[in-house]
From Swiss-Prot:
Residues 41-131 form the CoV 3a-like viroporin TM domain. It comes from Porcine transmissible gastroenteritis coronavirus (strain Purdue) (TGEV). GO terms for cellular component: host cell membrane; membrane. Disulfide bonds: none annotated. This is Putative non-structural protein 3b.
Amino acid sequence: MIGGLFLSTLSFVIVSNHSIVNNTANVHHIQQERVIVQQHQVVSARTQNYYPEFSIAVLFVSFLALYRSTNFKTCVGILMFKILSMTLLGPMLIAYGYYIDGIVTTTVLSLRFVYLAYFWYVNSRFEFILYNTTTLMFVHGRAAPFMRSSHSSIYVTLYGGINYMFVNDLTLHFVDPMLVSIAIRGLAHADLTVVRAVELLNGDFIYVFSQEPVVGVYNAAFSQAVLNEIDLKEEEEDHTYDVS
């Protein structure tokens, strides 16, 4: 990534070195005018090669500005690198004469930071900048990125157990799942509650949060043999209950 950001800088270094060599040769050469014309042609060729390199640099800077991760430590590392790029690396490139690289790096990252700072100001939560996203979900004060569905429906599914659930890389313990709620803030605004707790065969649970109640859950993952085994267990339990 770092190499892709400064391909244009390397191009200008090559052009500058080539110009210095040619200028030194011009002092000792008899046909000075002809050499100057040849030097101009070489620099023009280098300038034409600069455009695709500039495009690649812009793409890499944009990728860095928009890249997001769900891991807390990764987000902290990326945020620190962005701050260093805006406050140190970009101005340093401008000071050394690499104006295009410095201006593009500083401008793109700064605009993204200002855009996310608006959500930070409105919701008073720094996690918008940390996770580099415009929409977060908050589960009892713990923030995590909110992923929209394909139809832009607002619902959340969290994996967990009988008295806990995982929120990103954190574990939330609870007594009653019906007391757990999720607040969606940012570009979307919604308050979700638990509408269904789906128990898996291994004893774990999938908790469904939605604004609309869940009527039922259709299970199509089991084979016929597993379904027959479950039916037999249910019949045995019912039979035991009737006898008692």
